[in-house]
Each structure stands twice: as structure tokens, then as C-alpha cells.
Amino acid sequence: MLLIGVAGTTLSAQEVDWLQDDAVAGVVLFKRNFASRAQIVELSAALREAAPRPLLLAVDQEGGRVQRFYEGYSALPPLQGIGALYVRDPEAALELAFEHAWLMASEVRASGVDLSFAPVVDLGRGNRAIGDRAFSDDPHVVAAFAQAYVQGMHAAGMPVTLKHFPGHGSVLEDTHVDLAVDVRPLETLESEDLVPFAAGIAAGADAVMMAHVVYPNVAPETAGFSAHWIEVILRGRMGFRGVVFSDDIGMAAVRGVGGVVGCVHAHLDAGCDVVLVCHPELVNDALSAVAGRRSNTAALIGLIGRGALGWDGLLADVRYGSIQSRLFERFGTST
């Protein structure tokens, strides 16, 4: 199955045609799709109306520099700021993480979008792509935050996606533009990078997004291409039973693996449930790749639309203004 990207703030005839294909499980929204809060509500409704089946709508709304919806939404602080508070006041930091998660998830759901791919539970160890998106460099601190964030998102009625498994934070390279290789053995990864994922899974995380990183002392392929990582370690040893997403196949770290068709097949053959095709110019090739493959749409049913929530209802919720105020007082963020 595929989650695809669309080009703009309204749907083209070709994009409506893509949505008729059984292989299209949903749409990932980006800043290019955003003009205003009202427009996102309209686009979400138009996407659902155009599709002949339930459609999963997703976005990256982490806070900080990765926030696709902005005007009319809370300016969420990056997770690193919340992590820094943990040293002084762990209880207050974990409460803020819960509230950050609730606020983010509530605003996204009020816009008609099912989920934000969050939280990042990579370790903050200097990776160019992760940076301040990570809570901390300490696996056990990140594990505590992972559990609080899962609880906050679930309290808002949103499913949770832990990313980027098995950990993107301990390599320097940004997989958007480079191949990344982590040469540490599995024993080290299990005692460090996998700790937050185990905590998030234990807390009830619904999905995991794979990293486009190679761990050659565990498996020769990037993690998203690796049945060993997905089936043996994630589903086998760690007992994860939820949805497995690839990261975007347009990223440089996987671009050379058999083109779009080869990349899609490699992810699905390894055990990914859903492949992200975020660049519209790659969608036709991706659809050609999955023609004839069986689509397991049941895997995503639990991620779609957990009850109705609109902006009027959210704005009337007393928690909304109070949480915004607390985050503003601590980090200077606002709408």
C-alpha cells in the first residue's frame, strides 16, 4: 500500500484519479499543501470525498522546524527544549511532553487529518536531520518521554507513530541527501537506540516508521528494506503488532535501489505495510510497481478517524487555552 503526496492546496484531476486506485491507502500533507486552517479542513474533506474507500490522512506536525501547518496553529516548541527541562524537573518535563502531544494531536485532528507522524524517539546525538527534533541523548530519558507522548496523543484520540526505527540519531548523515551507515553491533543498539522504541511500544504505540539507515553488523540493507529488522527484531523480539511505515522513498539514501519500482518492492517484501511516496512525480511509477500486489487495507483501519473533532469543539475545550498558555510561558510559543 502507498501513502502519496499531492502537489498543492487543491486536487488536480490526476490526483483524484490516483485516489481511485486500491493501492492508495492515504495522503501525506506538507507545507506546500497549506494555505490556511480553513483551507486544510476543506482539502481534508475533498480528499475523503474523492476516495471510494476510507482514506488515511497524515502530516509531520512535530513542532519546531518540522511543522507543516502553521498560521492558525500553535507554534509548538521542538522536543529538545522539553528534554532540557528534564534535568531540572523531570515531572514537569514529562507533563509538558504529554500536553505538547495532546495539543499537537488535537489541532491536527480538528483539521480533519488522522495522524501526525510523531514522536521522534531517535537519540539526540548530533545527527544533521534530527537535531532539536530529539528529546535527549540519553536513551532512558527519551524512553520516559516516549511513554508520556504516547499517552498525550492517545488522550487526544490520535494514533502514535514512533520514528525512525531502529534509530537515526547516532549517525551524522542526513538521509534526505546522503547514505547513512551505523556500524555499531546489535547489542549496543539494543542497550541504547532501541530503548525508547521498546518503551513506546509498551505504552501502546500504533505504528513505527523505519529509518533509511544501514546497520551492516545487523543486516546488509537499509532498515526499511530488511526483513531481519522488521520481522525478526521489531515484530519478533520486540513484539510489535502495529503498522510499519517506510520513510519517504524520494530520499537520497534509498534513491539508487532499483528506482521507484525496486524501492517500493524492497520495502513491501521486507514487511513494511505502507510505503511513503511523498513526491507527486514518483506516484505513477509507484502505482505501476504495486499493480497486481494484494493490498492489506485492514492494517490501517485502526489509524483512521477516531471520532469526530472540529475546531469549534477544540476551542471550547478548557484544556486547549490552558495548555497553550503553559507552553507559551515556558517556551515563548503561541498561535
UniProtKB/Swiss-Prot annotation:
The keyword Lipid biosynthesis does not apply. The keyword Metal-binding does not apply. Substrate binds at D60, R68, R133, K163, H164. The active site is at H176, D247. The record marks D174 as: Important for catalytic activity. It comes from the Bacteria. Transmembrane segments: none annotated. Keywords: Cell cycle, Cell division, Cell shape, Cell wall biogenesis/degradation, Cytoplasm, Glycosidase, Hydrolase, Peptidoglycan synthesis. One of its GO terms (molecular function) is beta-N-acetylhexosaminidase activity. Its EC number is 3.2.1.52. Pathway: Cell wall biogenesis; peptidoglycan recycling. It is found in: Cytoplasm. PANTHER family: BETA-HEXOSAMINIDASE, BETA-HEXOSAMINIDASE-RELATED. Belongs to the glycosyl hydrolase 3 family. NagZ subfamily. This is Beta-hexosaminidase. The lineage of its organism: Bacteria, Pseudomonadati, Pseudomonadota, Gammaproteobacteria, Lysobacterales. The gene is nagZ.
